[in-house]
Amino acid sequence: MNAETCVSYCESPAAAMDAYYSPVSQSREGSSPFRGFPGGDKFGTTFLSAGAKGQGFGDAKSRARYGAGQQDLAAPLESSSGARGSFNKFQPQPPTPQPPPAPPAPPAHLYLQRGACKTPPDGSLKLQEGSGGHNAALQVPCYAKESNLGEPELPPDSEPVGMDNSYLSVKETGAKGPQDRASAEIPSPLEKTDSESNKGKKRRNRTTFTSYQLEELEKVFQKTHYPDVYAREQLAMRTDLTEARVQVWFQNRRAKWRKRERFGQMQQVRTHFSTAYELPLLTRAENYAQIQNPSWIGNNGAASPVPACVVPCDPVPACMSPHAHPPGSGASSVSDFLSVSGAGSHVGQTHMGSLFGAAGISPGLNGYEMNGEPDRKTSSIAALRMKAKEHSAAISWAT
């Protein structure tokens, strides 16, 4: 077999198919199922099998290797019915219905190129499988050569591979999914009707007690705040109330009593702190009201224009005792006293300045009106200064 013979056969597949379906070949089919084509070397079994091998491998070595062997094997197949019976064991039965003829094959140059063959339609495959024998070996190698190298072409109406039909199915109009059923069973709070809203617990009417009932309840409450069941039942019979109402009244009465007790304790604590804070102020005010007359003012009391009641009431009167003031120096001693005391006698300094600047002063002024509330900070600072001076004087006198 050579390449020219293969090309000439592949160029005329229609003629071979016509010869296969002709009445002559059908009448001959009953005698020999292996002779589908007219006899001759061109359409013989040797030629077809050798051509199939040549198409499968496409080289001269394979054609030369399998040519002789196929000729030896094809000879007994064409001869007798005994060989036909032994060969029928391995061949499928011919199909009863004959499908329509397959479309014409592509040109010869497409067979020589890799990847030119495509997957044939189902009808052509059935025809090749059912024709049996050498007819099946005619075009199967061409289709099987590139069947696994590319993606198969699917018709447009076929479903995509790997997808489940349940995901592609369209929901019916009346059908509901599991989520829809769950949402339908649980009503939303906005869809509640008036009857459902009125199903809540009804508010109990407020119990109004008469004066007699309150008096009896208060009597028992004065005896005990926690009456037992028997006492509550007896009280309920006397007051014409239920035992539950009596129990609720005692609970409320105990809460009211605890609230009053708490409020009373707070008032007691508040009054205690207020009295403890106000008592020292009163004693200090009484001390300020007592005006102590120093000796240097008493000696010059008649000649001095400054009355004794105007002397500032300093809380530390000992500042004047260790220093002896000579008589007749009232103004100088007052100025010295003001300069020594400094900020401690700020109120007295202002009043003394006004007294010395004025020509005459009415003696109707008293010490309480002239002396305001002394500043605590300034008085403490002045006291510390005086104590420091006393300490330094004592140390110098001892040395």
Swiss-Prot record:
Entry GO MF terms: DNA-binding transcription activator activity, RNA polymerase II-specific; DNA-binding transcription factor activity; HMG box domain binding; RNA polymerase II transcription regulatory region sequence-specific DNA binding; sequence-specific DNA binding
Region named Disordered: 68-133, 171-206
Keyword field: Activator, Developmental protein, Disease variant, DNA-binding, Homeobox, Nucleus, Phosphoprotein, Transcription, Transcription regulation
InterPro entries for the chain: HD, Homeobox_CS, Homeodomain-like_sf, OAR_dom, Paired_Homeobox_TFs
Gene3D superfamilies: Homeodomain-like
Tissues of expression: Expressed in osteoblasts. Not expressed in brain, heart, intestine, kidney, liver, muscle, spleen and testis.
Classification via Pfam families: Homeodomain, OAR
Residue numbers bearing the Phosphoserine modification: S188
Transmembrane segments: none
UniProt-listed GO biological process terms: anterior/posterior pattern specification; digestive tract development; embryonic digit morphogenesis; embryonic forelimb morphogenesis; embryonic hindlimb morphogenesis; embryonic skeletal system morphogenesis; hair follicle development; limb morphogenesis
Keyword Iron-sulfur in annotation: no
DNA-binding region: 202-261
Subcellular location: Nucleus
GO cellular component: nucleoplasm; nucleus; transcription regulator complex
Motif segment (OAR): 379-392
Comp. bias (Pro residues): 92-107
Family listed: Belongs to the paired homeobox family.
Function: Transcription factor involved in skull and limb development.
Reported disease: Defects in Alx4 are the cause of Strong luxoid (lst) phenotype. At heterozygosity lst is characterized by preaxial abnormalities of the hindfeet and, very rarely, of the forefeet. Homozygotes show preaxial polydactyly of all four limbs, reductions and duplications of the radius, absence of the tibia, craniofacial defects, reduction of the pubis, and dorsal alopecia.
Description of how the protein assembles with itself and partners: Binds DNA.
Protein name: Homeobox protein aristaless-like 4
Organism: Mus musculus
Lineage: Eukaryota, Metazoa, Chordata, Craniata, Vertebrata
Gene this chain is encoded by: Alx4
